[in-house]
Amino acid sequence: MHWGLFSFLFVLWFAGPVAAQTSITLEASPVAIVDATINGRPVRLEVDPRMPDMLALSTPAAERLGVRRLPFAQVQVGIEGGGSMRGRIARPNIRFGERSARNMAGIFPVPVSTRADGVIGPGSLPYDIVTIAIGAEAAAARDIVLPLENPDAWFVQADVGGRSLRVLFDVANDASILNRPAVRAFDRDGVIPSAGELSERPVILGLSTLMQPVTTSLTVHGIELGPTFARTVSPLLGALEEDAIIAEGAASETPPTLTLGGQALLSAGCSSVSVNRRTRQLTLRCAS
C-alpha cells in the first residue's frame, strides 16, 4: 500500500475489518473523534481521513491499554519525503458500541495524537457510510461526487493545474500540503512561488517537519487551496525515541499528491466529506 503521504508495508497480512452495516456522522470540531473500547477499556480515537484502514497507537498508549504486540510481526511506515519508522503489529479487540472490528493496529515510538488515545482511519469504522461534518451547510450547496479506488482509503484522483494528482483530506489542520513530486512539477510550471521562510508544520501521527510556504492560484474542483505549504527534504521531528526515524536513502516514488487542508474546505463552504462504501464514492458537500 503506497499513499502520497505515507505508506505501510506489513511483514504479516491479516483479514480486513468486519463488514459495515450502517452510518455514522462525526463532528470535526476541531478533529473528528469516535468513542470505542479497546480490550474492554473505553477510549477516544481521532479519525484521520489520511489514514488507511488501521489503528495507530503510541508505545505508551499501547502499554496503558494493555495492547499486546504480536510476536515476530512488524510494520514499517514510510512517510513521504521524511524517511520511515518501524513499529509492531497488534490485533486488539475494538468495539464501536455494539459493533466489533478486528482492526490491524500499529504501535509506534511517536506521539500519534495529543487529542485522543490513538488515531484510526475512517475505513476501519464498521459502517456503510462515514461522514465527517466540517461546518454549517451553505444555503445553496452542491455535491462533488468522486470515485474511489478503495472505499476504505479516502483519496481520489483529480485535475490540479492541468496535472493528475492524488488528493487527500486533512480536516484537523488548516494548511494544504503539496508533496515533493507535486512540488517539483508545479515549481517547473512556475505556479507555486515561495511566500516566506521555512516553517515547522504537522505531518501525521504527531510528527512534524519544516515546510516552505507558497502562494498559488491552483484549485481542485473549484476549491482554492488556501494556505499552502510545500514539502522539503527536511527530516521528520517529534519521535519519542532517538533512532525511531530511518533516513530516506532513495528518491520517493510516491505520486504527486495534494493534501487539502481544513481552511480550504471551510472557505469553500464545505459542510461535510463522506464515503459510501457500497457505491465506492466520496462526496464533498460544498457551497455552489
Annotated model-derived regions:
Residues A19-S288:
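Pepsin/retropepsin-fold aspartyl endopeptidases
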